[in-house]
Amino acid sequence: MLHQPKKIDDRFIYTDKRRRYVSFPLGGIGTGSVSLTGSGRLIDWSIRNRPAIDQFNGYSHFAIKAEQDGKLLNALVLNGPYEGTPTGSPSARKFDGFGFGANRDSLAGVPHFDDATFVGRFPVAELEFHDASFPGQVQLTAFSPFIPHNDRDSSMPVALFAISVENDTNAPIDYTIALTLGNYGCDSGIHTFTQQNELSILHFTSADTGYPERRGDLAIITNGEDVEHVDYHFRGQWFDSLGLHWREFARAGRLRERRYDKPRATTNMFQQPEHGTVAVRARLAPGEMRQVRFAISWNYPLGSIYWFNRDQPGSPSFEGRPPTWKNYYATQWTDSVASGTDAYKRWDALEAQTVAFRDSIFGSSLPSEIIDAVNGTLGILRSATLIRLEGGEIWGWEGQHIHEGSCEGSCTHVWNYQQALANLFPALERTLRETEFSYNQLPSGGLTFRQRLPLGSGFDIIGPCADGHFGAIIKAYREWKNLGDNAWLQRYWPHIRRAIEYAWSPDNPDKWDPDKTGVLWGRQHHTLDMELFGPNSWLTTMYLAALTAASIMANAMSDPAFAKECHDIAAKGSAYVDRELFNGRYYAQKLDLSDRSALTPFDQGRKAGVLRDSFMDAYWSDEYGEIKYQIAEGCLTDQILGQWHADIAGLGDLLSPENVRTALISVFNENYRPSLRDHFNPCRVYAYENEAGLLLCTWPDGTTKPALPAPYAEEVWSGLEYMMASHLIQRGLVDEGLTIVRAARARHDGSRRNPWNDIECGSYYVRALSSYALVNAYSGLWFDQRCGEIGFKPARAGDGVYFWSAGRGWGVVELKGSTVTLIVKGGDLTVSNLRMPGLSGAATVDGQAVRRNGDLILLGKHHTLRAGDRLVVEVDAYGQA
């Protein structure tokens, strides 16, 4: 394998049963993706502005053949064993799918390697192929650029493949390595082979005359010295195309060129696209190794609202076809040739930076389960869950159905949890704040939680949700703190202020906090897709964190009266939550479930959550005499979600630290199950039998579970597991936190689920990007660009190396003895102070004495560090307090 800084942990090596569900996404942020399976198949071709889970692009594949003295030694598809269902998967088409055998496009029926070993360390995948009958050793490395703070190069619509072949025999061998690609989604292709300097390019365009948003192009690019090309595979019916291609490939000699002057008149009876092949020949002496590179690039420039429902109340109206928008990548590269050649020409630099990021994570002192959680979820950023709009803005689904997105609109009560963009690509995260304040804010100040496309085309009809609404304010503070730009805050401060005031506004129909008590009392929509009523710590702590953040921002915006008002309201609310909602073990909801009158102020005709029932029918049960879908005395995993956000943003304690710690321990003790075999779950099943997991909510002994509790309560969500684990680690409960992470990752080991696809309400579910909080929780990263301060307090004492990404740069910090070395590997970082708890004695920076104020080392000036720079701090002694 290439690029191995140290021995690879076995958990990242996938063989045999653990290889079965591996599907590793390749592509850029907002470009869609294609995935590489654990056996080397190209699948999940989600590149045409919508998901295509478990879908092939015709019979696209890599293949290799070996010849000697004009005779064929062997020819194999560059795949390992077929691991799909032998009877076929369900399909909407007749004469296809279940009951019709293994998918033909998987090439299960074409000779391939006996075995394969997959190594997945995001953003790089590596495969070794094994077959005693093949003369040579074959490896494949695949990646797409993924470089923190470099969002342009990380948004390239490309997948890059390097195939290495070693002749391990005692005689010369002629090898041919070929890439066959289908002209995806095209009925009648136009394939053009050109050479640009050292690059050979097969460009796939279309003669189709359908709607503009369905058009696009792809390219194969290589720089091999001896290149062969088959512009078109045979146009025929039945199995002619693949049959003749393999017949012509699996024989000695060069490939037969084939061109057609006219577009295809009739489509294949099995709806196969047209195909083309580019191959590189190389003669290798005994013991010689050669690497051949291929780029696959794509360009489907226009997105459209394919999911649009004209009959949905509150939806914008339009005539004719749904509106379209241009993808960001299409504003940067004119077509697939432009993006592919750009990536190819800069391959070495892009790979070096991508591998540097990978090695900084995998070479760190983070526990392997945390590395695995981050490794397994960052691929969501390059999946079809994300769209990057023409101006560079991020817009997202919650997850993905097989052929379309799941739950549109950058849903704030789900996107609240993801922490990856804010740390690795903060400029992209800021676009989420900017668009929600610019396009989601109602005249009343409320923030709707789903964003319509195109931007500015209307509001979601459900209105604000409490967790998402206050999350926007907390995260605006986080973005300002990490950016350090008062002008940015000033631009959005009027929106933030109005959002805070919405809590007590008479125009708020949900009557959250009309008396400014610091507690949410009214109707509170939330991420369980229904509403809570009455005081509860979950949503009130979100309110408290938002009030605390608003108080600080108001002072910075020269609004001291509002700052004091927010501070005082928060103080009252905090006292109430600790006094009235903490039961000695955890925080609960305060509501008399038998009091029907608690609902009557909110029976105003607006629908209940996601239900179509009338409000009272949705929330009141005559049979049980009880308000439905509440938490009541339950121990909710999310019960102090606002404190988690506050800890991440550096807002301090919202509640009693002792109570917070006790509540976190209770969540672990009550909600974590080492085995779910005896657990009853009538909801969606994301963990089962002997698997371990953290439940959303439980009702401990001595409490009463509502007859009809909050939806999903019995489920296990990995996004909540990562959140809770990081919060436990933040608060010093490291073993408990790691136990939860291990459980989540054990379920995603490849044998039952894809390690790179955490599911919830669909595939590549964005809540799972809460996993990135584990990185900062364990390293104890503290960063505030406003004062140029960075610091670390690792969860475990002793020497270590930790990844960081902050400001406009990223790198590692090395802690060794009494020496702290801050290393920048990409971007730049401007710092004035270094905070390291546990310091004692004198301090020097790069050999020069500096002042120290407790845990804070005062560097004396702004230090701007760029890639390759390091800051070395020596102290008399260092050990975490």
PLM regions: where:
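Non-catalytic C-terminal accessory modules of carbohydrate-active enzymes
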Residues: 41-43, 49-53, 57-72, 76-77, ...
